[in-house]
């Protein structure tokens, strides 16, 4: 098995969905790769940092366990503000460039930048019968009520909602 940052570079090299699924299938048995994908693609996991520096080190080797332990501090907000910034800089200093820029940094910015989504990963895991799934959180978008006049019966007050909230209805005495 390749290192996760090498896998990401391979995934970047081709835009074919089938190619990406093949590469993911070959490497999804790795717990490190699974955990990294989950941290990156799970929309409910946030790190609370906006700027993640690039790495210029040619030497270094940050162990996955160390990264995960420190990432948990960011997720749980035990490190915030300057302490979080300093923690991230310490992680950068322990890593080498490929390792940090192509794997750890991309997890923290929540973007693998290789054309892989949670849907692709979940499809591959399902095909392999793995007990692994990245949660998918999709917002339902609002539709124009004017296109569905039959659904609104009687008199009512209507307020446009553009944020995805569908409807709040108050029913008095069982009648609409």
Task: Describe these PLM feature segments.
Residues 1-176:
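N-terminal nucleic-acid-engaging modules of covalent nucleotidyltransferase systems
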């Amino acid at each position: 098995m390749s290192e996760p940052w090498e896998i990401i570079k391979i995934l970047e090299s081709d835009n074919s969905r089938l190619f990406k699924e093949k590469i993911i299938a070959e490497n999804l048995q790795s717990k490190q790769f699974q955990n990294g994908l989950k941290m990156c693609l799970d929309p409910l996991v946030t790190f609370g940092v906006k700027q993640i520096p690039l790495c210029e080190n040619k030497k270094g080797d940050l162990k996955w366990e160390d990264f995960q332990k420190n990432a948990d501090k960011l997720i749980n907000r035990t490190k915030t503000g300057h302490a979080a910034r300093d923690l991230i800089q310490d992680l950068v200093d322990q890593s080498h460039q490929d390792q940090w820029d192509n794997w750890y940094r991309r997890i923290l910015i929540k973007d693998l930048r290789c054309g892989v989504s949670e849907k692709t990963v979940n499809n591959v895991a399902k095909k392999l019968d793995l007990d692994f799934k990245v949660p998918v959180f999709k917002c339902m978008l609002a539709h124009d009520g004017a296109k569905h006049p039959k659904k609104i019966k009687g008199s009512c007050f209507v307020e446009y909602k553009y944020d995805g909230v569908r409807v709040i209805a108050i029913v008095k005495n069982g009648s609409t």
